[in-house]
Amino acid sequence: MEIIMDIALNIGLKYKEEKTVAMNDTAKVFGSGAAEVFATPMMIGLMEAAAMNAVKSHLPEGYSTVGISVNIRHISATAVGKKVWAVAELVDMDRKRLVFKVEAFDEDKKIGEGKHERFIIDEQKFMSSLK
């Protein structure tokens, strides 16, 4: 366990985020392809949500995380109507930088895998820096 700013996170922490693929989640609607299948950007978003939610309840009020890196392979297509889920596992930490192993599945198979990095932020300071 590593403690940063009174934040205690354990390597191996996992979270599962799931949804059912709708037409709005397809490559055709999203604009990332012509097929009516689960879009790669939507899969990556599901993976990011799993990683964000894995640590969300462990952060003090006023802190959250932002995505800083994705290295993902989308290895299989998924049809509209199928249930999909992403699992994020915290595998490394370097102060405020968090590294997650991420995988996505549908009802039949693994559909994606890779690495996702997030950074812990003080929300107020972060938003003030954008003005």
Language-model features, listed with the residues they occupy:
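Hydrophobic beta-sheet segments that form the core/acyl-binding groove
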Residues: 72-107
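Catalytic strand-loop segment that frames the active site of acyl-thioester-processing enzymes
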Residues: 4-39
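Residues at secondary-structure transition points
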Residues: 34-42, 79, 99, 121
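Short coil/turn motifs at secondary-structure junctions
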Residues: 24, 52, 91-95, 105-109, ...
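Surface-exposed, gly/pro-biased binding rims or lids
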Residues: 22-23, 31, 117-131
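Hydrophobic beta-strand-centered segment that forms part of the acyl-chain substrate-binding groove
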Residues: 53-85
